[in-house]
C-alpha cells in the first residue's frame, strides 16, 4: 500500500510537469493529463503493470513529440535548428546529456549544452531538479516511467507476440557495452567541451529537432541519426522485444544505473517462492535479469533494472514485486 501511494504521488508530479507545465490554460493539455492519470489509476487498480504502463509511456512519447514539434513551428517555423540558434540557447534542455554535462561543469564550470538556465519548464535548473528527485525516488525507473523518448521503443517492442531474436545469453555483454559507451561519451565530451552524444549519436532527432544541414559533417550526422533510429528504436526492439537503444546506447540510462543505490524503490524477488522458470528474464525489457541472477538467488534484478514491472506481470508464482529499499529508507530516516 505504501509503495502504491508513493507511486501515485510521484506520477501526479510527472503528469503535471510534462503534461501541464507551461500550458495550464490549454484544453489539450488538460485532456492529455486526465487521460494519462486514468491510465495510471487503471494500472494501480488492476495491478497490470505490463499493459497500462506500456500504453502510458507510448502515449507520453507520441503526444510529447506532437506537442514539441508544434512548439517548434510556433516559435521558429521549422524542426531544424541553426548553429546560431543552438548557441543562443534556443532549445530546451535534454536530460540525456546530463551525465556528459556534469563532469565538464564540475571541472571547467562549462555548460556544454547551451540551453536556458532558468525561466523555462525545460531549463537546465528545472530539469536537473526533476532528475535529482527521480534519482532519489525511483532511480533508473525514469527510463520506464518518465522518459518521453523511451516510449517509442516501448511501443515497437509490443508489436510482436514473441521475440524473433533472443538475447538473454548476451545480457551481460549488452550491459557492459552500455557502461563502456557512457564512459566514452563522458570522456570525449570533457575533452571537446561539446555535447558529443547530441551532435552525433542521438536517434531521437527525428522526433524532436535536428541541426540544419549546411555542410558535410552535419549531413553525415543526420545519416547516423536516421540509421540509429531505424536500427535501435525500430528494428531491434521489434526483433528482440527489448528496449534496445535504452539498453545499449543511452548514456543517461547507464548513468541512472550507477545512481541506483540512492533510489528508495526497487524490485524484490522472493527466492523461496521462485521456481526458476526464467519467465521474468525473458520478459525483462532492459536485460537486467540473467540466468545467473535467478540461479544465484540474488533476490533482485541487476543494476540496469528500470522497474518497469514486466517481471512482476510475467511471474506465475507472484514472487516478484515492488519494494522499498530498507537501507535507503534507513539513511533518510
Regions from the PLM with identified roles:
Residues 1-282, 287-294, 303, 313, ...:
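Non-ligating segments of multi-cofactor redox enzymes
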Amino acid at each position: 500500500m505504501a509503495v502504491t501511494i508513493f507511486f501515485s504521488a510521484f506520477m501526479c508530479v510527472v503528469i503535471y510537469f510534462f503534461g501541464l507545465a507551461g500550458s495550464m490554460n490549454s484544453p489539450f493539455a488538460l485532456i492529455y493529463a486526465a487521460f494519462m492519470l486514468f491510465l495510471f489509476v487503471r494500472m494501480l487498480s488492476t495491478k497490470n503493470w505490463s499493459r497500462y504502463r506500456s500504453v502510458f509511456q507510448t502515449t507520453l512519447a507520441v503526444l510529447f513529440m506532437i506537442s514539441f514539434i508544434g512548439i517548434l513551428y510556433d516559435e521558429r517555423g521549422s524542426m531544424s535548428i541553426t548553429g546560431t540558434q543552438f548557441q543562443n540557447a534556443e532549445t530546451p534542455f535534454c536530460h540525456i546529456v546530463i551525465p556528459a554535462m556534469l563532469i565538464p561543469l564540475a571541472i571547467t564550470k562549462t555548460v556544454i549544452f547551451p540551453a536556458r538556465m532558468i525561466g523555462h519548464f525545460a531549463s537546465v535548473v528545472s530539469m536537473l531538479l526533476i532528475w535529482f528527485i527521480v534519482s532519489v525516488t525511483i532511480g533508473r525507473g525514469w527510463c520506464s516511467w518518465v522518459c518521453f523518448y523511451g516510449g517509442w521503443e516501448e511501443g515497437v517492442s509490443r508489436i510482436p507476440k514473441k521475440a524473433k531474436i533472443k538475447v538473454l545469453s548476451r545480457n551481460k555483454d549488452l550491459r557492459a557495452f552500455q557502461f563502456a559507451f557512457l564512459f566514452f561519451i563522458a570522456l570525449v565530451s570533457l575533452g571537446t567541451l561539446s555535447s558529443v552524444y547530441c551532435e552525433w549519436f542521438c536517434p531521437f532527432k527525428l522526433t524532436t529537432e535536428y541541426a540544419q544541414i549546411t555542410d558535410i559533417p552535419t549531413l553525415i550526422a543526420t545519416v547516423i541519426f536516421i540509421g540509429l533510429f531505424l536500427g535501435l528504436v525500430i528494428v531491434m526492439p521489434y526483433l528482440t522485444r527489448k528496449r534496445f537503444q535504452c539498453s545499449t546506447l543511452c548514456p543517461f540510462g547507464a548513468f541512472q544505473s550507477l545512481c541506483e543505490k540512492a533510489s528508495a524503490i526497487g524490485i524484490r524477488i522472493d527466492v523461496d517462492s521462485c521456481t526458476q522458470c526464467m519467465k521474468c528474464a525473458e520478459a525483462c525489457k532492459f536485460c537486467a535479469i540473467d540466468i545467473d541472477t535467478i540461479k544465484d538467488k540474488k533476490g533482485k534484478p541487476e543494476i540496469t533494472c528500470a522497474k518497469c514491472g514486466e517481471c512482476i506481470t510475467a511471474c506465475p508464482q507472484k514472487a516478484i514485486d515492488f519494494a522499498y529499499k530498507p537501507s535507503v529508507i534507513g539513511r533518510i530516516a
